[in-house]
Amino acid sequence: DIQMTQTTSSLSASLGDRVTISCSASQSIGNYLBWYQQKPDGTVKLLIYYTSSLHSGVPSRFSGSGSGTDYSLTISBLZPZBIATYYCQQYSKLPRTFGGGTKLEIKR
């Protein structure tokens, strides 16, 4: 199985900040990477598919980039509703596998 690693498990930032969350794969996944947002209430939403394509209804403050084994999700102008845990998922090879998640919190 392909192992997905999110080295930062938690991240604290201020409102208005630009935040980047990283994800790496144990082998090249050819841009077959999605990003998901899980809110504190458990709601899960697809944000980005195929590395950089914004899912319908997702604010343009969210963007994705990367290639090969290294990928990132960037949130510009952080807003309160962005507080969540973010997961990368590869679908280059079955089984689909997820990173361990990065929990984003507001710095007080």
Curated annotation (Swiss-Prot):
Superkingdom field: Eukaryota
One of the Pfam families matching this protein, by short name: V-set
Segments of this protein annotated with the region Framework-1: 1-23
Listed CDD domains: IgV_L_kappa
Biological processes, Gene Ontology terms: adaptive immune response; immune response
Span list, region Complementarity-determining-1: 24-34
Keywords of the record: Adaptive immunity, Disulfide bond, Immunity, Immunoglobulin
UniProt entry tagged with the keyword Disulfide bond: yes
Gene Ontology cellular-component annotations: immunoglobulin complex
Framework-2: region residues: 35-49
Positions of disulphide bridges: 23-88
Region (Framework-4): 98-108
Region (Complementarity-determining-2): 50-56
Residues in the signal sequence: none
Location of region: Framework-3: 57-88
InterPro entries in alphabetical order: Ig-like_dom (IPR007110), Ig-like_dom_sf (IPR036179), Ig-like_fold (IPR013783), Ig_sub (IPR003599), Ig_V-set (IPR013106), IgV_Light_Chain (IPR050150)
Other remarks in the entry: This chain was isolated from a myeloma protein.
PANTHER family: IMMUNOGLOBULIN LIGHT CHAIN (PTHR23267)
Protein name, as recorded: Ig kappa chain V-V region MOPC 173
Organism: Mus musculus
